[in-house]
Amino acid sequence: MTVDIYNNRFYCGLKSFLKNNPVTRPVLMALRKRRAVKKQLAGAQVFHRQIHQVFPLVIKKFDSLGIDYFICFGTLLGAIRENDFIKHDDDLEFGVFSDQYYSQLAWKFDEIGFKKQYRYYLADSSIKNEGFVEKYSNGQIHFDLFVYSRSTDNIWCWSYLKDESNVLTAIKLQWPNSGLQRIIFQGLEVPVPRNPKGFLEALYGKGWSKPCVYWDDTMAGNISQIDKTRGRFEHV
């Protein structure tokens, strides 16, 4: 007889006990991080075999849209720290601004073989045009599109972290609005935040120049808000 342990009351109760027990919780968290790193490294092998051919196509498409955009998170970190993609990275990250974002962007990326797979968003419907993160893929290479908001003084976006119970924690990250500039990366003029090192230090801390295999955004230094009930997810 086959038992579905994920719907078994004993298993679910044991899992809840272990996860909330102060002695066993750190062990479970360490195992979770180890699984995440192993999965990421496997994806990184595929990513690095193809990214040097695919990246110029994506940049060219972004340039054709006539909107402000920039590389961010791990893609920016690799560009500034290593002048290359991070060895253990398995996707790209781009930012656009909510005042220029439009839903038809998905059609534009479809023209180069990237289809929108799913998106994260805020549950609070009173917050308009804020908090979107979209995932695109051509089957091998993936990129995240973060929709930033901006004011005269600041820019901010939301990131989402899923726990083992599939609950999404929404994390608001904020930086000073310093504008954008272009740098040469992979032989291309690529937009980045002005003062990119300051942008990275705000996010990753003063040790941003030292590689760290495992990272999640709860470790960020520029969190302005964190909420375990506000994240939502949908397939597109």
Positions of PLM-derived features:
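Helical scaffold of the NTase/Pol beta-like nucleotidyltransferase catalytic core
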Residues: 6-71
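Catalytic metal-binding acidic patch
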Residues: 83-105, 187
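Active-site nucleotide-donor binding segment shared across nucleotidyl transfer reactions
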Residues: 59-92
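Residues at the C-termini of beta-strands that transition into short coil/loop
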Residues: 73, 98, 149, 194
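Conserved catalytic core of two-metal-ion nucleotidyltransferases
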Residues: 40-63, 110-190, 198-203, 214-236
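Terminal accessory/targeting
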Residues: 2-4, 17, 41, 211-213, ...
